[in-house]
Amino acid sequence: MPGHAFNESHAQRSGLTGGVSDRLHWIGGAGDDCVPGHYSIGIRTFTSSIANVAPRLSLRLHELASAGQSTELTKLMDELVIPLYALRSRRKGYEVSAMKAMMDMIGLVGGPVRPPLVDLREDEVEMLSGTIEKWRPWL
């Protein structure tokens, strides 16, 4: 029963937050692409693969979401985050492959992926180069 699960989950959250209020932080286990949704329901943290390549961009996503500046946040998401996540979703494991490739491309050490993951194809590396060019102000 969906209502039961929600009510139980809500009760559990209420039980967890009782007595700790602002000292308990919900950590969003998903990444940069979930920032708008997570922040809209009170989650104020996220795991960021983007921070490995462009920590300033990751921090800006947090700042905008925290301040409720949805117009600018949506613009950054649409222009810089969603295209990367679209590439990463092309194949299982590309979450890792793409970020390692980006690190290598900007002079950091991403290194090779471990099996069973595979490297990006050449055309996808070219696409990633375009992403990096758009990210230049954040590097």
In which residue ranges do the predicted regions lie?
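Short, structured secondary-structure boundary patches
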Residues: S66-T71, E95-V96, T131-R136
